[in-house]
Amino acid sequence: MLEKPLIIFKAIILFFFFISFSYAELLSPNSTISPKEVIKIQLSGLQQNDLEYKDSGIEQTWKFAHPNNKRVTGPLSNFKMMIKSDSYGMMINHLSHTITELGSSDKWAQFEVIILDKDKIYHKFNWQVEKYTSEGTLKDCWLTTMVSSPIPLGSSI
């Protein structure tokens, strides 16, 4: 008699357990995330853009954009259009990426990023992050301030 309610209870617990993992929240900036990790988070999101939900990778990238960068690109809807444009569309669902530090200080870091897009073409970017120094929730967080236009490097085949 007690078996059936216990099985139902276990099924409900498992259901909510799996739901909580299938809709994981996006990562937010915090002062413990290194400059290179910021770029890894952004690129991993773009590599699996629709993993959590449609455009979750673009939204993840947006969360780590510097406020000055956000003022230039406009609201998230504009940022999504920019990332999906011909200029940056190769970042969406790319196959792989490498991140190489070019230089850094205690306030900025510059990286070379090479992406292999889904058409197996390599693209190089310069990616810069800066430490946010103003007061508020972003203080001392590393945030993206600049991503260059891509430089095509040719096919992997």
Language model features by range: what are they?
Residues 52-106:
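Short solvent-exposed beta->alpha transition segments
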Residues 34-50, 64:
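Short, aromatic-enriched amphipathic alpha-helices that serve as compact interaction elements
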Residues 10-20:
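Bacterial N-terminal signal peptides
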Residues 2-12:
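Bacterial N-terminal signal peptides that target proteins for export
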Residues 101-157:
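Exposed beta-sheet edge and beta->alpha loop/turn motif
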